[in-house]
Amino acid sequence: MPHIDNDVKLDFKDVLLRPKRSTLKSRSEVDLTRSFSFRNSKQTYSGVPIIAANMDTVGTFEMAKVLCKFSLFTAVHKHYSLVQWQEFAGQNPDCLEHLAASSGTGSSDFEQLEQILEAIPQVKYICLDVANGYSEHFVEFVKDVRKRFPQHTIMAGNVVTGEMVEELILSGADIIKVGIGPGSVCTTRKKTGVGYPQLSAVMECADAAHGLKGHIISDGGCSCPGDVAKAFGAGADFVMLGGMLAGHSESGGELIERDGKKYKLFYGMSSEMAMKKYAGGVAEYRASEGKTVEVPFKGDVEHTIRDILGGIRSTCTYVGAAKLKELSRRTTFIRVTQQVNPIFSEAC
């Protein structure tokens, strides 16, 4: 019997953060580093908990080199060879603690993951990524990976509801990726009608995860630094970015020049372009659930990173949070019908 949930579910665009009295004198006083101890791996983390998405146009070794300078994290896409991993590890040993090796559920993916982690023991994070984290097959896969790598920290997803967050944590995952369909080049919601507004998903999933001493990543839906701050305010331990980090020198994707302007290709990993590149095309039984866009070339990613971090620091000063850790406790969301004056501005 179909059921309608009448509870209002909200996205980042539906809210603003209410300002509160603050004792902070300057944005420079804000500490954006977080330290976590993970439930299943028993490992610890310290850094600025923003992650470059495991897309081949974002989660690149070139991106990782820059992000690790700021103590940010990179989920490296799964299409690098073992030789490429070894070459990067040899040249950039200081970056390895800020990286995850990614894998799908396929046997070839898992075999390569094993080879990478055996060859480069300094990599302690695994990102298990599927479009639909609700399948029993994926739960069993997480259990198998935990059994094989008992001391590695496992990120797993994607899901959007508390009960599945709990099941994945109890199956061996440490950090759950939250988000179905909010990404800028994801078309899952249009193709399938399935999804969940990201702000509400983060709030509900964070509550479920934290009750089990687990953690979550808000994956997708951010279009500006304010959205990243809202995700942290909603309870996300980490925020994963794709579109905001696309189009840079360090991003993957072909560089195109047209009419004197430069663009970089950016596409979803379930797009027709990605499937042609890695699977020989879209299988007869499925549809593409991603799109390809041309992002105006933005130059070095360092400027974008500073803009994002500066925005979050400013958020913290507005709500009186001296540390990023305090942001969710200082957050009160107010529902709005408009966020910005649109006369001279873009969407965000």
UniProtKB/Swiss-Prot annotation:
UniProt keywords, alphabetically: Acetylation, Metal-binding, NADP, Oxidoreductase, Potassium, Purine metabolism
Binding site for NADP(+): 26-27, 78, 129-131, 180-181, 269, 285-286, 314-317
Pfam (any one): IMPDH
A molecular function GO annotation: metal ion binding
Domain of life: Eukaryota
EC number: 1.7.1.7
Binding positions for K(+) per the UniProt entry: 181, 183, 186, 189
Enzyme class: oxidoreductase
Subunit structure: Homotetramer.
Protein name per UniProt: GMP reductase 2
UniProt gene name: GMPR2
